[in-house]
A protein has these predicted regions:
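A common structural junction motif
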Residues: 25-28, 71-76, 81-82
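Short S/T/G/P-rich N-terminal loop/turn motif that feeds into the first structured element of a domain
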Residues: 1-67, 87-93
Length: 93
């Protein structure tokens, strides 16, 4: 299983994020997408306040998705929200 993990520095506006999902996330081919608030950390303040995850069954599906116009457009729109974020790709066993 492959995941793209997006960590937002602050929580996005709920209406704006709903628009982002409807217009830019839903067109991306993936087996699952989830998102939510970060509510804590065992080591003081959390490093981020909101997370999102895309999930793919295999590397081939992941590569097809991240090289798509839809994935690029989603990243551009995420940047347009003006919230600093990081993206990590992970292979989950």
């Amino acid at each position: 299983m492959i995941r793209a993990i997006i960590q937002y520095e602050t929580e996005p506006d709920s209406e704006r994020y709903a628009q982002h999902i409807a217009e830019f996330v839903q067109p991306i081919e993936c087996s699952a997408f989830r998102h939510g608030k970060v509510f804590g950390s065992p080591f003081g303040e959390p490093a981020c306040r909101y997370v999102a995850e895309f999930e793919w069954d295999d590397m081939e599906s992941f590569k097809a998705a991240v090289n798509s116009d839809a994935f690029a457009a989603s990243g551009k729109d995420a940047m347009a929200m003006g919230i600093p974020f990081t993206v990590h790709f992970a292979s989950i066993e």
